[in-house]
UniProtKB/Swiss-Prot annotation:
One of its GO terms (biological process) is isoleucyl-tRNA aminoacylation. One of its GO terms (molecular function) is zinc ion binding. Zn(2+) binds at C892, C895, C912, C915. InterPro entries: aa-tRNA-synth_I_CS, aa-tRNA-synth_Ia, Anticodon_Ile_BEm, Ile-tRNA-ligase, Ile-tRNA-ligase_type1, Ile-tRNA_ligase, M/V/L/I-tRNA-synth_anticd-bd, Rossmann-like_a/b/a_fold. IleRS has two distinct active sites: one for aminoacylation and one for editing. The misactivated valine is translocated from the active site to the editing site, which sterically excludes the correctly activated isoleucine. The single editing site contains two valyl binding pockets, one specific for each substrate (Val-AMP or Val-tRNA(Ile)). Its EC number is 6.1.1.5. GO terms for cellular component: cytosol. The gene is ileS. Its cofactor is Zn(2+). It is found in: Cytoplasm. Its main location: cytoplasm. This is Isoleucine--tRNA ligase.
Length: 929
């Protein structure tokens, strides 16, 4: 008896169904590094238009977390897709190396008692160790870049160019020195940038305090009264009693209506909208009378006594006064609040600051001298009670600024700092705020809501405090006059001389510099060397100048900055401000892309204490980096990205669908040589031409739309759908019969293989930016071998087809697919009751509208192959309907169709006439399916 299994074209796939990624990926990485893939790619891409994604530098401290992984994976997908789109897209990874967290770690490891030069040396060594650890993990994720030559903000050249950027801003006229209230961390002992502040709930005392009016006659006149008997008080409400020793004024709203109210305490001035609630707080229900009303502008320049100090307190009109809460009168301490500072500055009131850098009151402050501010609250409340000026006291929970490092409450404290002014006219007469808002208009945002967010932040932000009182940072390399505080008149030239020294020796060149090396003897007498360092956000915010503008392979401005949504306050903004404040005069990027934060499967923030942290190292060691990459790509990053073991298992199913499809495709291409065996499109079987159209349209959507607009979750969805629906459930299902049963070298089979070849090359190129390991594994088979890379090639070129022909083809096969789905549905009940097993055991009678019936009848004898049944007939009717039944034919041992001609050919007793022809004759021909 003949064994017909040897006559079918069942070939082994060179692409295994099991990826075994976690085990195999490291070996691929080693091979790519040895082949110098990144360097070869730079040579191949030379001369193409550039696409520059500038890397926002992660901080060089600790292991990478899942947020880092998402960020680097998204960047890598873009770099790879742009490369395959025909761009030269170099990627230079970077690290942020200066700043307090590294200082804290070095102090923990080595203590504080050492020369500052040695301390900075240890900081540099620590940062280098952290970078080496992080780099290893980033490479393991498959991120392609110039890892041998990353940029570090502690590189001597980068430090020097950061100093040059400071010089740019100085020359532009935006830099100034001032004593202004800034967010100050008592644990850091330093001012904080906006991006270093986070808000958490805090319980604070909420108190109502009476300020006695000095001149009740003037108060009466303001309310239109002839006179006032007894004492009168302005009542303020505050949640920061510790700021009262610095109180220098009381602010009222010019348009706010105020009432003069007679109470058991005396005459009180309160905002009309808040008076009722305030009086309840004071326990006043009887003996109350409203004497008069007036507006805040009439109260301007009245004077009061401080509630417990001997100090004159003027009443000012302030735009910041509201009637949302409190009393409508605001105690004003310019040393401890930006709005307070602004209103006092307008009235020419000189700032008084009783709190030092340790958060302690200076010696001249009665009762609280030497105390830390938080310790002073109960003392001040007691003091107010003694003077009779505490009307009410309670506790309130409210959102309050905290240090992002120490998680401790911040204070506003006036310090001598260096600022980049937002509303100061620069050398060109324009303010930095106006320039930055225009730059926002000129930037493209992904997602689009990022524009309004960044614009609102720039509109509302204070001047940028760029100085820090730390040791490990890029120095502010200025010489300051000892008496006037003015910068040296030759500061621009001196900055460049210092920058040249820093290029050679790093920042230590400044800290060890003797003034006499650069200044005359007279200047040495009159000028001090500034000891401040720069805000680390100035370091990273200047990398568009120190890196993008300096490195030969890059181009300024960058095409894209891509970071987490917190960077609207951080790197996006600091980069925008340095770009606009320098001679470049614009944003250093054309596009901004923002991704959300990673949360657990239930949408909760990840926390070590909760135990819901998913580490990227665990994921790639268990599942492989390609699964992590597919998860990142398949999640809509514009919101929060949820991850858990269950979610990763679902992602693995999608990966398996793609991989199994490729395994099938490669198996059926293993005896196909595209040069010798390919069939011209005009000679191809019709369904093969239709499949090519589907594949080309998929590529057009991904390469022409989803990849360019960074919509990777749509790209993944379409690829998985294409593999499962267009290929798995339709085309490949139909194709199996032709691939397996027709003659190996027949036009029918070679036509199918030609289509599969184009589909496979295109699909591998499309998955490669996301599944970089799997893409390269597949390209080793269909591309140019081990030394070749999918990245060395651009998107696949499909055979061209006439538009009209394509439209007709798609219309026809869309109708045929609809009929096929109806046939499948009609067979399901027969499968369920076990009347049939395979659909090939069934026959189908299809009733279809005239046009569809015409398409189906055009397939002739090949209709059964398209419908995946052993027999199919068509008749015209008003709507689509299918009657299915079990076939009464006999099963062919070779093709498994049920026909009435099994054994019809002598010598082929167990196979159908078609199979006998395919085995012993010239073989069948196919035109449609």
């Amino acid at each position: 008896m003949t064994d017909y299994s040897k006559t079918v074209n069942l070939l082994e796939s060179p692409f295994p169904m099991r990826g075994n990624l976690a085990k195999r990926e490291p070996a691929w990485l080693k091979s790519w590094y040895e082949q110098k893939r990144y360097q070869k790619l730079r040579e191949i891409a030379k001369g193409r238009p550039k696409f520059i994604l500038h890397d926002g530098p992660p901080y060089a401290n600790g292991d990478i977390h899942i947020g880092h992984a998402v960020n680097k994976i998204l960047k890598d997908i873009i770099i790879r897709s742009k490369t395959q789109a025909g761009f030269d897209a170099p990627y230079v990874p970077g690290w942020d190396c200066h700043g307090l967290p590294i200082e804290v770690m070095v102090e923990k490891l080595h203590g504080k008692d050492m020369p500052k030069a040695r301390f900075r040396e240890l900081c540099r060594e620590y940062a280098a160790e952290q970078i080496a650890r992080q780099k290893k993990d980033f490479i393991r994720l498959g991120v392609l870049g110039d890892w041998d030559h990353p940029y570090l903000t502690m590189d001597f050249k980068t430090e020097a160019d950061t100093v040059r950027m400071l010089g740019e801003i100085y020359k532009s006229g935006y830099l100034y020195r001032g004593a202004k209230p800034v967010q100050f961390c008592l644990d850091c002992g330093s001012s904080l940038a906006e991006a270093e502040v986070e808000y958490k709930d805090k319980v604070s005392p909420a108190i109502d305090v009476a300020y006695p009016f000095k001149d009740t006659a003037a108060l009466a006149a303001a309310f239109g009264l002839a006179g006032i008997e007894g004492k009168a008080f302005a009542v303020i409400w505050t949640t920061t009693p510790w700021t009262l020793p610095a109180s220098q004024a009381v602010s009222v709203g010019a348009d706010v209506v105020y009432q003069l109210i007679d109470t058991p305490k005396g005459k009180l001035v309160l905002a009309k909208d808040l008076a009722e609630d305030a009086l309840k707080r004071y326990g006043f229900s009887d003996g109350i009378a409203i004497l008069a009303e007036t507006t805040g502008d009439k109260l301007e320049n009245l004077h009061m006594n401080h509630p417990f100090l001997e100090r004159d307190i003027p009443m000012l009109n302030g735009d910041h006064v509201t009637t949302d809460a409190g009393t409508g009168l605001v105690h004003t301490a310019p040393a401890h609040g930006l709005e307070d500072y602004a209103v006092c500055n307008k009235y020419g009131i000189e700032l008084y600051n009783p709190v030092n850098a340790e958060g302690r009151y200076i010696g001249e402050t009665p009762r609280v001298a030497g105390m830390r501010v938080w310790e002073a609250n109960p003392v001040i409340l007691q003091w107010l009670e003694e003077t009779g000026n505490l009307l009410a006291s309670s506790k309130i929970e409210h959102s309050y600024a905290h240090c992002w490092r120490h998680k401790t409450p911040l204070i506003y404290r006036a310090t001598g700092q260096w600022f980049v002014g937002m509303d100061k006219a620069g050398a060109d007469g324009k303010t930095l705020r106006d320039k930055a808002i225009k730059a926002v208009d000129d930037t493209e945002f992904f997602p689009s809501w990022g524009r309004a967010r960044l614009e609102a932040m720039i509109e509302g932000r204070p001047d940028w405090v760029v100085s820090r009182q730390r040791y490990w940072g890029t120095p502010m390399t200025f010489f300051v006059h000892k008496e006037t505080g003015e910068l040296h008149p030759n500061s621009a030239e001196l900055l460049e001389k210092v920058a040249l020294k820093i290029e050679e020796k790093g920042i230590e060149a400044w800290f060890s510099l003797d003034k006499s090396e650069l200044l005359s003897a007279e200047d040495c007498e009159n000028y001090d060397k500034l000891s401040d360092t720069m805000d680390v956000w100035f370091d990273s915010g200047s990398t568009h100048y120190s890196v993008v503008k300096q490195r030969e392979e890059l181009e300024w401005p960058a095409d894209l900055y891509l970071e987490g949504s917190d960077q609207h306050r951080g790197w996006f903004q600091s980069s925008m401000l340095t770009g606009c404040a320098s001679s470049m005069g614009r944003a250093p990027y054309k596009q901004l892309l923002t991704h959300g934060f990673v949360v657990d499967g239930e949408g909760k923030k990840m926390s070590k204490s909760i135990g819901n942290v998913v580490a990227p190292q665990e994921v790639y060691n268990e599942f492989g980096a390609d699964i992590l990459r597919l998860w990142a790509a398949s999640t809509d990053y514009s919101g929060e990205l949820a991850i858990s073991k269950e979610i990763l298992k679902r992602v693995t199913e999608s990966y398996r669908r793609i991989r199994n499809t490729l395994s099938f495709l490669f198996a059926n291409l293993s005896d196909f040589n595209p040069i010798e065996d390919a069939v011209q499109q005009a000679d191809m079987v019709e369904i093969d031409r239709y499949a090519l159209v589907l594949a080309r349209r998929l590529q057009e959507r991904l390469a022409g739309d989803y990849y360019p607009r960074y919509a990777f979750h749509f790209a993944v969805k379409e690829m998985v759908s294409f593999c499962s629906e267009d290929l798995g459930a339709f085309y490949l299902d139909i194709l199996k019969d032709r691939l397996y049963t027709t003659k190996a070298d027949s036009r029918a089979r070679r036509s199918a293989q030609t289509a599969l070849y184009h589909i496979t090359r295109s699909l591998v190129l499309l998955i490669a930016p996301i599944l970089c390991f799997t893409g390269e594994e597949a390209w080793d088979i269909i591309g140019g071998g081990e030394e070749d890379s999918v990245l060395f090639h651009t998107w696949h070129e499909f055979p061209t087809i006439n538009e009209k022909t394509e439209a007709e083809l798609v219309k026809k096969w869309t109708a045929i697919r609809e009929a096929r789905e109806a046939v499948t549905a009609a067979i399901e009940p027969l499968r369920a009751d076990k009347t049939v097993g395979s659909s090939l055991q069934a026959e189908a009678e299809i009733t279809a509208p005239e046009e569809m019936a015409g398409y189906l009848n055009a397939l002739g004898e090949e209709l059964r192959f398209a419908m995946l049944v052993s027999k199919a007939e068509v008749k015209v009717g008003s709507e689509l309907a299918v009657a299915a039944k079990a076939s009464d034919g006999e099963k062919c041992e070779r093709c498994w169709h049920y026909t009435r001609d099994v054994g019809a050919v002598a010598g082929y007793e167990t196979v159908c006439k078609r199979c006998a022809e395919n085995v012993g004759g010239e073989g069948e021909t196919r035109h449609y399916a």
